[in-house]
Amino acid sequence: MTDFLGIDVGASGLRVFSDAKLPAIAVIDAPNSSKNREQDLIAALHSLSKQKPQLSASRVCLGMSGFSSLGVSAAAVTAEIRELFGAEAVITSDMVTAHYAHFGESEGVAVVIGTGALAFGIANRKAQRIDGLGASLGDFGSAYWIGLKAMRRAIRDSELTGDSDLLSALEAQTGPAAEWPKRFARQEITEFEVASLSRKVSELSESGNQASLEILTEAGIVAAESAVACASAVGTKSVGYGGSVLLGSEKARESFLDVLADHDLEAAELKAPSGIGALQIAAGVENERVKFLISQGLAHFDGHS
């Protein structure tokens, strides 16, 4: 039996950690839809049990996207973990595990800008989330935000000025622009397909494409605005940042860090994966930070195995 397990659950599946110094001991590719997050997660846990039939632990912490907003029953998930792995369980958000992986019990703001976007801070016995509202209402600066803005900008530039460089690059990846309105109306273009266009925008920016440079600069700025607001709300100067946009785009990262510097915030890259934060929370349910998370409804702990 393993003492503790940390499970990181994202939109594409889950990763399992048993040692902070080692890579994931298991990876389950099992997409988690927003509509069926709880059922998809439980199915992924069953897949993990089949892949690792001898896996057991005294306590598991699972950090998942959508914990707070998608109607997931923490009690149902903890019951499955107890049944499958014989373990006590802590269920929380991946924003909490990302924060804990970097800051532990220290104070600061974790900003993750990937397919989605959010800032989460803890300081002075206060917790604050900014954004993380999904593609329809938020995710400012995210890969999806970049991809959609690029599609809109590409069509607009082509129609108004005849500049088709960005449009041609996007069409090469996602098909003719003339088909986009119909595909959006039929919901045939997924959030992940739109988000994947951010990589093309980043590539074009490196070759000097002006539209791409402007989009990525704005992405960094709006992401930084979330960080600044979050830091101000809890009263901290420390920011950790990560995610595919900030780590993969020099232009977005540059504008992000410039805004933070203008507000005298100290920034450092998030190094440890969220799953390590989950592992550390599993091991630390008696410490004051984890007790605070539970008291604020940011984590659910079922201590009856």
Question: What spans do the regions from the language model cover?
Answer:
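ATP-binding/phosphotransfer module of carbohydrate and carboxylate kinases, centering on a glycine-rich
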Residues: 1-57, 102-109, 151-305
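Short acidic capping loops at alpha-helix termini that bridge into adjacent secondary structure
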Residues: 56-58, 87-88
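FAD-binding subdomain of flavoenzyme oxidoreductases
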Residues: 61
